[in-house]
């Protein structure tokens, strides 16, 4: 016990846990920092027992801390409206809006359009909503993303969005909905480069590994050292697989925010993951790859693995824009469907701008 009030702060996202700490006498107050940016209504939702509506901070560090340190206005992947709340006004003309894609960008756009007074239908071809967030919630330390998916779904439904899962957005279906505006939020798909052996080697994607659809065996080679590749390696080493990785760029984890990258790199070192950089893969095999060192020009190989996992990035999945462009006065493409690779902050930021433009 100390004779002064004690305030705890640091990655608190669950009000029930904060309340427990106070009741146990471990602190007098709990401070919510980034969580208050992600969802300023946290105290009210907690008081009213509406925890399912609570949008958690997912610790992405994409728009808050970096912007603050650079002297720029902060934003938030979970709440891009922060600082722009006054812009979210009722629409002057109520429209019929069709949103295609149920990832974070699509759901956020659908909800905001509904809140502005539009009639909104959200079409998602898969049985579940979430998009890339579903996969992103599997790596170690990323479980809070599943809470973000839950809150996006709950808040969409409360706003009155007509959600249709397991429904492919064909031109015929979209036309039958008579849209005044269409938002295409179909995201991205794993990149497959025209490298010899790739189509015949039986490689799995990082997404298949993270979601349990692929059996990798004990020894695994991950091709691609960006964030997805690194998180796939963490996922596998946590399950006692022996994993190595190969990356074309000179740096592993180049697209990871510095605050998170240092922990990931320490984890790779802890599990003795071999990291070959400056390596351009020139041939795929079932048990590994041949590559060329882009610095020395020498050829080398990494072979003898039980499986090879692809994490070479993403490309936009936008096959619908051309097919739908004449079905509504406004057709807006957002997120990774517009430009890949991207991130969650860009997806929800695009969603906000699209909703305000309709």
Predicted regions, residues:
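Flavin-dependent oxidoreductase catalytic cores
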Residues: 1-100, 104, 108-120, 200, ...
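Short, Asp-centered acidic motifs that coordinate Mg2+ and/or phosphate
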Residues: 29, 181, 307
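Small-residue-rich anion-binding loops in enzyme active sites
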Residues: 37, 41-57, 167-188
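Active-site/binding-pocket entry motifs
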Residues: 63, 70, 81-84, 188-190, ...
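Rossmann-like dinucleotide-binding cores of NAD(P)H-dependent redox enzymes
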Residues: 122-159, 233-281, 338-342
